[in-house]
Amino acid sequence: GIELPGEEGGILYNPKDMYEPDVATMAIGQGVAVTPLQELRAICAIANGGELLQPYIIKKIVAADGTVIKEGKKTVVRNVITEQVARQMREMMEKVVSEGGGKTAAIKGYRIAGKTGTAEKLAAGGGYAAGQYIASFVGFVPADKPRYAMLVMLDTPQGAFYGSQVSAPIFRDTLQQILFAKGIQPAASEGLPLSRR
């Protein structure tokens, strides 16, 4: 946890308790529920080579005299995927931005990895609420040596509702500001994944 009020647990079933239809519905994002922070934490594990990190909100608390009272430190909870699987996922996520549905998150000259998301909202009485969606885009940059990860999630956007249409452009615009502020220069690859040919 992150020690904030209102923090929720996600819904992710134990494979031992699942049936074949559960696997099929989970493959398209149904039957799973995570908070934005939980989703970003999972994406960071892909970005960093497989380590699930303990998130923290406060980087450092410093007293007036300069004494460090508390400091957030990198804490690895466990390895959740191998480096090889993480690399394969990074490559696929980079193609989402360079070739797939996440092109609206692309910034010329930068290697960005990402994933679009469009989820139906649950109705109060069960089932799904007609015309109500959560649109998201999550990603990190640079795709080959990640430094920054971000999630943009819109609850019930009006008009267009796909993550690629509404969330990815916000991700791109925000990321451009971060890259500029941090002085991160474009890669020589002009934003395209390196070819293995």
Locations of regions flagged by a protein language model:
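Gram-negative outer-membrane assembly/targeting C-terminal domains
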Residues: 177-197
